[in-house]
Design a protein with these regions (language model features):
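Glycosyltransferase catalytic domains, chiefly GT-A lineage
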Residues: 1-285
Length: 285
């Protein structure tokens, strides 16, 4: 039975993000086979060959817009869903464990998202001032917007209105800066989630030395297991394999630049030699 009070939403602008979203949904359906999924996208594709996409339940919201406008939709999520309880997952996530308890959190809180365990140092995020220029993002505890549980209400509508306004006002490509200010100025009851709810894997995760999280957020850590799954989906949906491979390589280059050539070499070795182990851990075997 479809639960009409709950929904899960993704925003996939660009072909790579569409296949990432569909891979995330593949892992989701091993945990939750019933909750309705919305996919907001600017790619006109046919999911007919995706066996875990239920056309009678799930819904694609197609907007022929530029890919760089994706955050305009993210900061206005509440406009696209009627369900009472909602979770937004970034496309580059894998759902590895049950998350049912989070729905009940929304009986007591208006919004739940991960509190970042370290300072935000990234240029364009951490060095931006908020709250009447009183604080820099790097000087204040902050949240990550990759996984957001929220409950529909007038308060949440006001929060999204603020978030969208701050995003436009800041005129930067990151939505996280506006997220901070809108959260702090809102009257929402905010539940900070722990790291397992939105986990960024390091080399120890791929070595199998880290407990499996609830939600894995791999960003540019696109292993060979993940890459092969993405390419399978690209073939099923008849999307542009060349473009998707190029985008994957670009993201990997970003990871290599961040961690250095030696650590990148180690990571690739682990991806190669622990391929089957990783498949099992990611529920993709």
């Amino acid at each position: 039975m479809i639960n009409k009070r709950k929904a899960i939403i993704y925003i996939g602008f660009g072909e790579l993000y569409v296949v990432m979203a569909l891979l995330s949904i593949k892992t989701l359906r091993k945990i939750d086979k019933e909750t309705k999924v919305y996919l907001i996208t600017n790619i006109n594709f046919d999911p007919i060959n995706i066996e875990y996409w239920n056309k009678d339940r799930d819904k694609i919201l197609y907007f022929p817009d530029e890919s760089n406008n994706n955050r305009e939709y993210k900061t206005s999520l509440n406009k696209y869903i009627d369900e009472e309880k909602v979770v937004f997952f970034d496309c580059d996530t894998l759902i590895l464990s049950k998350f049912d308890i989070a729905w009940s959190y929304l009986d007591y809180f208006d919004i739940a998202l991960k509190m970042n365990p370290v300072k935000q140092k990234k240029i364009g995020k951490g060095d931006v001032s908020i709250l009447n220029n009183k604080y820099l993002i790097r000087d204040i505890p902050h949240f990550n917007s990759g996984v957001i549980f929220f409950k529909k209400s007038d308060l949440i509508d006001e929060f999204f209105k603020l978030w969208n306004q701050f995003y436009k006002k800041n005129n930067i490509k990151y939505d996280q800066v506006g997220l901070m200010e809108s959260l702090f100025l809102s009257k929402l009851r905010i539940l900070p989630l722990t790291e397992e709810w939105n986990f960024f894997p390091d080399i120890n995760f791929f070595k199998g030395k880290v407990k499996k999280p609830i939600i894995l957020h791999y960003t540019n850590r696109i292993s060979y297991v993940i890459e092969n799954e993405l390419l399978k989906i690209a073939r099923l949906t008849k999307l542009d394999l060349c473009e998707i491979k190029n985008k994957i390589n670009k993201k990997r280059s970003e990871r290599k630049l961040k961690i250095g050539r030696l650590e990148w070499f180690k990571l690739r070795l682990i991806w190669k030699f622990l391929y089957k182990t990783e498949q099992k851990r990611l529920n993709l075997s």
